């Protein structure tokens, strides 16, 4: 494929993803600069797409050191542990995820288990996935400062928690070593907990946040640079009220070293680097804020390992779409 054709394909990819131009704002759903490494969490359709058991640990410290007026550290932190593997007897793959997301005085722990059915489309694979999730959300309302001390919504509330069930659905399509495209919905039910207080004037409750994800990427190589793999990709995350766009580009040298940059629309520029030694990959990114509010930068580190499996399948010479 010549350079002109490659560039045209990349342009089409980004136009498709960003054609629905909604104003980008901050939102509650967890965000990752290394979003290409957390496919299985955001899209159950990806489960089992690669030839092995993949385990990922990802930790993000957003706005590191940010505090409130009382000196309490309220910067968001997110830890994700996920894994997926092919499951031939079920014609697809399985995935699990455990995530803790802390934002100020709010703490969320999410556990998920999912399955993806793989359809062979002749040269490409479509994964159709569903995952059930349990979310435990807790908030220490006693630490919140209301504009009105007698705010009826906060009357009788202290440190409250509730458990909610929801599920995710996803489609993930990939052409080996060529193109991938995914669309998913997280928290389809948008579940609501029982009332947290008995206030007759106003009651408070927790809800899960229905979030839509789209992701696409196009790994390719130039004939004159066979030792380099370029991976442009883009993602959209939206809960309708707010939308976030990411666009990134990576270069991978000899399948060992990777370097890249990520732009999160109207929020940050992320610098990314990674190294792969056999089946172990370590990745790091640093986000430089562009909001102009004096917010500190964000750190993210990921560690992943692939346990190779002999699945007695017809040999296929391609790599996973995971690129650190």
Model-predicted segments: where are they?
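Bacterial N-terminal signal peptides
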Residues: 10-20
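Sec/Tat signal peptide C-region and signal peptidase I cleavage site
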Residues: 21-26
């Amino acid at each position: 494929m010549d350079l002109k054709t490659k560039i045209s394909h990349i342009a089409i990819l980004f136009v498709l993803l960003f054609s629905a131009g909604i104003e980008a704002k901050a939102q509650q759903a967890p965000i990752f600069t290394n979003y290409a490494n957390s496919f299985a969490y955001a899209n159950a359709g990806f489960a089992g797409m690669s030839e092995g058991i993949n385990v990922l640990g990802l930790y993000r410290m957003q706005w590191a050191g940010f505090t409130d007026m009382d000196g309490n550290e309220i910067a968001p932190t997110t830890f994700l542990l996920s894994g997926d593997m092919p499951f031939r007897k079920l014609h697809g793959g399985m995935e699990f995820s455990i995530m803790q997301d802390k934002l100020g005085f709010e703490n969320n722990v999410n556990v998920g288990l999912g399955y993806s059915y793989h359809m062979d489309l002749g040269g490409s694979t479509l994964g159709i996935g569903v995952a059930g999730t349990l979310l435990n959300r807790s908030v220490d309302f006693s630490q919140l400062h209301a504009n009105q001390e007698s705010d009826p919504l906060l009357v009788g509330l202290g440190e409250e928690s509730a458990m909610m069930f929801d599920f995710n659905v996803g489609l993930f399509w990939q052409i080996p070593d060529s193109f991938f495209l995914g669309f998913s919905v997280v928290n389809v039910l948008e579940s609501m907990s029982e009332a947290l207080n008995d206030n007759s004037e106003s009651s408070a409750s927790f809800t899960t946040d229905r979030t839509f994800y789209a992701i696409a990427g196009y790994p390719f190589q130039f004939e004159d640079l066979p030792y380099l793999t370029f991976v442009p990709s883009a993602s959209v995350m939206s809960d309708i009220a707010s939308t976030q766009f990411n666009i990134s580009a990576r270069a991978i040298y000899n399948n060992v070293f990777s370097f890249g940059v990520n732009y999160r629309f109207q929020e940050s520029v992320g610098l990314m680097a990674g190294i792969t030694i056999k089946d172990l990959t370590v990745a790091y990114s640093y986000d430089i804020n562009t909001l102009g509010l004096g917010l500190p930068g964000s750190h993210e580190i990921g560690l992943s390992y692939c346990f190779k499996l002999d699945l007695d399948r017809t040999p296929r010479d391609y790599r996973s779409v995971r690129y650190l």
